């Protein structure tokens, strides 16, 4: 079932900085990563449209689309608009995944959530790709847009203790371990704009988000990042 599978797909961006073991980073990949970090780390808010593609050997390709909002510290709102309305919210401490047609909402502490979208809140943080990947190099994959390049990130398999304080977002997100093979990030090397993220998981499962129309530092209301379950909606705790 797609909903269950999405909760199992974790992003390389979840892994907190390590105290040791430097990543193997090619010079061109390092320059592209710096452009990406410079583009987003100073933004207080971000907004974009997204197209999600999920594929596995049993269900084939499924496509959804909507809008996503990010705000410091570690808050997100994913509004799915087509083909079905859904809502994924992180308020920095708790993540909620609400499907109105199911009359249920799944809830998890951010430190326990393995949903791969959760770590993307670090776009507005200070994490560096060179600290998050065991290997970071240029992929031979063709980019979707002219002028872009594709970074290939191989995740660190070991769990790591973060340098940051316990209440830091990087320290609070659940670590991942052997849940995916690689992450491909399509980036414009000049502007640093993130165009696409593709997570490749064992078993032929892939989850891809294509982003567009990025807007930075727009005024976003606090209420966007808080969820109140409507009357009659069952709250289900995500299994630990």
Regions found by a protein language model. Give the residues of each.
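N-terminal leader/targeting segments and the immediate start of mature chains
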Residues: 19-62, 229-240
């Amino acid at each position: 079932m797609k909903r269950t599978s999405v909760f199992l797909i974790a992003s390389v961006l979840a892994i907190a900085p390590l105290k040791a073991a430097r990543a193997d980073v090619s010079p061109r990949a390092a320059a592209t990563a710096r452009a990406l970090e410079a583009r987003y780390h100073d933004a207080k808010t971000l907004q974009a449209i997204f197209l999600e593609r999920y594929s596995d050997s049993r269900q084939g390709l499924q496509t959804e689309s909507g809008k996503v909002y990010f705000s410091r510290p570690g808050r997100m709102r994913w509004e799915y608009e087509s083909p079905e309305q859904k809502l994924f919210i992180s308020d920095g401490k708790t993540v909620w995944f609400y499907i109105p047609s199911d009359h249920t909402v799944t809830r998890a502490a951010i430190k326990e959530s393995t949903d791969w979208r959760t770590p993307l809140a670090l776009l507005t943080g200070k994490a560096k790709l060179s600290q998050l990947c065991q290997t970071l190099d240029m992929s031979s994959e063709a980019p979707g847009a002219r002028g872009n390049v594709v970074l290939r990130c191989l995740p660190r398999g070991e769990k790591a203790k973060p340098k940051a304080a316990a209440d830091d977002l990087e320290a609070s997100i659940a670590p991942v371990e052997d849940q995916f093979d690689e992450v491909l990030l399509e980036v414009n090397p000049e502007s640093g704009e993130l165009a696409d993220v593709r997570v490749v998981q064992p078993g032929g499962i892939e989850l891809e988000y294509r982003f567009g129309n990025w807007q930075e530092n727009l005024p976003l209301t606090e209420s966007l990042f808080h969820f109140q379950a409507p009357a009659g909606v069952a709250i289900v705790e995500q299994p630990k």
